[in-house]
Amino acid sequence: HLAKMLSGNGHDITVIDSDPKLLADVASLADVLTVEGDSTTFAVLRKASVRKCDLFIAVNHVENDNVVAAVLAKQLGAKKSIARIDNNEYLEPNNKEIFINMGIDYLFYPEKVAAQEVINLLGHTSTTEYVDFSSGRLSLVVFRLDPTSSLIGRELSGFKDDAAQLSYRTVAIARGGQTIIARQDEIFMEGDMVYVIARQDAVKEVMEFSGHSNVEINNMMILGGSRIGIRIATELQDEVNIKLIDYNAEKAYRLAELLDKTLIINEDGRHIEAMLEEGLANMDAFIAVTGRSETNILAAMLAKRMGVKKVIAEIENLDYINLAESIGIDTIINKKLVTASNIFRFTMSTDVQAIKCLTGSDAEVLEFIVKPNSPATKHPIKDMRLPQDVICLLYTS
């Protein structure tokens, strides 16, 4: 996914992997060069001409390989190197400094970022996606138009008229697997996923106007003792009653020692009767993070059917995302998109402060600083000649 996105933005990409089939699949989807071999060897890195690269990204599933490859690439001449890690200990300030001294510019832990996204969403249950921009002054919120929504059949401009006092702007609409950059004459339809940027003090009113309101989370069930599940439970177990379910008995015992305020249950989340016996219907939130997309989707569907107010599922197969959204799962977490959002900004100008790849959409939201005397400062925003698929949302000064 990352290679496809970067190549689509005009970058020259070389992909290294020891699996020839994987390389063939990547080459069929994106305009990239491929090099077969072990990325932790000098010979393969030299063959890939890392000495000429502006950015080396090590996102293998093996943490040690990523660290070694990123260090070697930097020593061979790469201008910047990034390594995906699985150990939160590496991110502690003193330890992080060691990796910087070794030549790694940025360490990225996708599970930590994904867990934090879930925690943020549990504080804003009315939205299916929530991201802060401009140091918290602006927020991206996403909501689905349910059959009873008063917005269905109305033009986007009508939404603005009724909520004129709100400081917001609609970014895009995801509909039927397609992304529509919002224009004032666009008509809302049932099932639309609507993406809105709003000022922080207007988020609550925007969501209420759209027919969604926050619910308090007191009881929560997590399916899967994965790194994401553990981090969520660790952060929230002092505030929320949590049940964490995992099918592996040995792991369940380890989790019970680690999470002293979380009720750990050794059970298979695919068994409907077992889930109901554990009180699924009484939960305010259900989070499926087993690491298996199919299991997460089925469990999330059951939770929705039982009336759980907030249902979140980790879905790593990108082909399943639109399906999952169409059947009513509130929020999708995808580590590929989380990784892409965090790494993509390293390919941009230093003036880009943040970037978010939208789940269920092929659009991105960028926050950037306008330089003095740049072309953007010489015209009103309405007179800027932006590409057809680009929209200026809000600005702060």
Locate predicted features.
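Segments forming oxygen-rich coordination pockets for charged ligands
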Residues: 115, 119-203, 209
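Long, charged amphipathic helices and adjacent flexible linkers at domain junctions
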Residues: 127-135, 208-223, 228, 349-364
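Conserved small/polar residues in nucleotide/adenosyl-binding loops
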Residues: 395-396
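Hydrophobic, well-ordered beta-alpha structural blocks that scaffold small-molecule cofactor pockets
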Residues: 1-9, 171-178, 183-239, 244-248, ...
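Short amphipathic
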Residues: 138-147, 356, 365-372
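Cytosolic ligand/metal-binding cores
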Residues: 2-123, 233, 237-352
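Short beta-strand/loop turn elements enriched in aromatics
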Residues: 149-167, 372-391
